[in-house]
Design a protein with these regions (language model features):
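DNA-recognition alpha helix
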Residues: 60-76
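Short helix-terminating capping/connector loops at secondary-structure junctions
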Residues: 78, 117-118
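Major-groove recognition helix of helix-turn-helix-like DNA-binding domains
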Residues: 75-94
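Long amphipathic N-terminal alpha/beta scaffold segment
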Residues: 109-117, 133
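Acidic/polar active-site rim loop that often engages polyanionic ligands
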Residues: 69, 84, 197
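A short structural micro-motif
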Residues: 71, 92-95, 107
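Single, function-defining residue in the core of a domain
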Residues: 1-64, 89-92, 99-103, 119-122, ...
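Secondary-structure boundary/capping residues
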Residues: 77, 94-97, 113, 198
Length: 281
């Protein structure tokens, strides 16, 4: 436990050290939040406060202020009341933080992926999960949740759907999208595919094996590849054998998918590699 706490402390400090202060100014200017500087709490200080609150969740807000060494003067040099800090965070809104996240993730994840390339390809992965959010009427209405039988009712907490694209060698996020529990992972992933650069390989699980996501990703760029395990019931027709356990195959695209995107063809091709690990059937 002590080692985990130490690692978290070092990682948090390292992240804050790598954060360019100019990006915070840009985030405020690009989202029209710079006018907050005229208030008692400078907007850039509030951004640092929100970052600290996310990294040091076990600390109170005043403790975060002290740990980061933030200077939060009030009017006429008076100290800002602790109750003003949550209000300042709410005034800041999500736009500057979202802009800052996109800026940091794009720079750090792309640099890392290029540095740890495999056979000249930057390696990424897309996957999804569900997160519990605070139980409130607003969150239940917005996110929904898992429902079961009438006797058991709904899940204990509202659930948000999260899909991310990650540089796999470093685990740095390139992008993230949230949605309601009823929103499918492939739907959220549509906004993430364009973030992946050329000369890349994206590894996904079987749930993402669909033409609407994979086909545009591979065709609307240069040297883009994807890799996934196929489901046992995946229908494919062999076009040509390339070697032992190596085939060029054709897969059908459903009428529903083509109705949603008329640009999709009736079929698409992929390379199928078949193998069996020792001890597995």
């Amino acid at each position: 436990v002590a080692k985990a706490v130490w690692f978290k402390e070092v990682a948090s400090e390292k992240l804050l050290e790598q954060l360019d202060e100019k990006w915070i100014d840009e985030a405020l200017e690009m989202t029209g939040t710079a006018t907050m500087r005229r208030r008692r709490l400078p907007a850039e200080q509030v951004v640092w406060l929100v970052l600290g609150m996310s990294l040091y969740r076990e600390l109170t807000i005043p403790e975060v202020v002290a740990k980061l060494g933030l200077s939060l003067p009030g009017e006429r040099g008076l100290t800002v009341a602790p109750s003003a800090l949550p209000q300042a965070r709410a005034r800041l809104g999500e736009e500057p933080m979202a802009w800052l996240f996109d800026k940091c993730s794009e720079k750090w994840a792309l640099e890392s992926a290029r540095k740890h390339a495999w056979r000249g390809l930057s390696v990424f992965g897309i996957d999804g999960t569900c997160l519990r959010v605070p139980d409130s009427k607003a969150n239940r209405a917005h996110f929904g949740g898992q429902s079961s039988s009438e006797e058991k009712g709904e899940s204990g907490y509202p659930l948000a759907r999260l899909v991310t694209v990650m540089a796999l060698r470093s685990h740095l996020l390139l992008g993230a999208r949230f949605g309601s529990y009823d929103t499918g992972e492939t739907t959220l992933a549509k906004e993430l595919w364009p973030m992946i650069p050329d000369n890349s390989l994206c590894i996904v699980d079987r749930g993402f094996l669909s033409a609407p996501g994979l086909l545009p990703y591979s065709l609307q760029g240069a040297n883009r590849h994807w890799l996934t395990r196929a489901k046992k019931n995946t229908a494919m027709r062999v076009i040509r054998k390339l070697g032992k356990g190596d085939e060029l195959v054709e897969l059908n695209i459903s009428p529903e998918a083509r109705a949603n995107d008329p640009s999709l063809p009736e079929h698409w091709t992929a390379r199928a590699v078949r193998y069996q690990r020792r001890g597995f059937q």
